[in-house]
Amino acid sequence: FLRGNVKMEVGFTVAPNGTGFVANSTFMPGVTAEMVDWWFGWHSVGPDLRYKIWDPEDHYYARAMDPAYVLDPKVPNNQKTWGVTHDISEDIGLGVDPLKLSFKKPSDLGYDMSLIGTPGCATMVCAVGVSGSPAVMTHKVVNAEGGIWFKSHFWVGYGLDESGRIN
């Protein structure tokens, strides 16, 4: 995933065990990887409107449970989500669902950190969602002429067990 394209850029599938995989790739003109890094911290520590900007019809709020860490100027923008849980309200198609997103350092999910900041992956945001429908989320940003490709992968049905491992 970090080294280049994957077989499924857009679409979904259901595995034999009932879990799902969703992939999406969106070109965002005029956007940079640095903007994405900044936004992921910024949207969780201010008015609810900040999260609604992403999707005004389906996003209601996202609130960092440790705003002091997110606001700390010593923490680089690309690390402001690492280890922070967000309390979120949004609708992913089945009605409003409160969830908690536990953001992770990409290496916590097995990604090679040496590949982040390269042409194949300018930056990355990872989280594990806890809700009625748990999921693992990865957003990879690839620089492109005139903007970025924002590539999202969701592994639906996977969450954290008591030890903090993904199951």
Model regions: which residues?
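Glycine-rich portal/gate segments that line the openings of hydrophobic small-molecule binding cavities
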Residues: 56-131
